[in-house]
């Protein structure tokens, strides 16, 4: 079994120092944030997508230390009722998937997202109980009008 760590824990370090620390700690894998809530300190999506030399240097820095990428992470909300947040989250996720494909990274971790209560909502709403019935209606709206269509399109 290979053991790894989420690189976001080491945002106090630069990329090379983070990799050295992880390798010297005896770990095998790193999960790298690409944007959204984990941030993108160690992985600038646009730079890596646009430049093969930068992609090769990025991977060389990792593999030269005997490390592998277990996955990319872009935890955000692609179905947010805030259209700007939703657009940014969707773009980050799609770019992360493209980069994972280019670098043979096997996993992209993300959040499924949380919609608002209805089409007029300004903030996400997370109903956790089926009663009163308004919560069931919110739940149904979120799943059938937001989550399922978004993820079917992405897939």
Model-found features: residue ranges?
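Transmembrane beta-strand segments of Gram-negative outer membrane beta-barrel proteins
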Residues: 1-3, 67, 90
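Short polar catalytic/cofactor-binding loops
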Residues: 7-13
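Active-site acidic/histidine proton-transfer and metal-coordination neighborhood
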Residues: 17, 56, 61-64, 71, ...
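Glycine-rich, proline-tolerant flexible connector loops at the mouths of alpha/beta enzymes
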Residues: 33-59, 112-119
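Glycine-/proline-rich flexible loop or hinge segments
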Residues: 38-45, 73-81
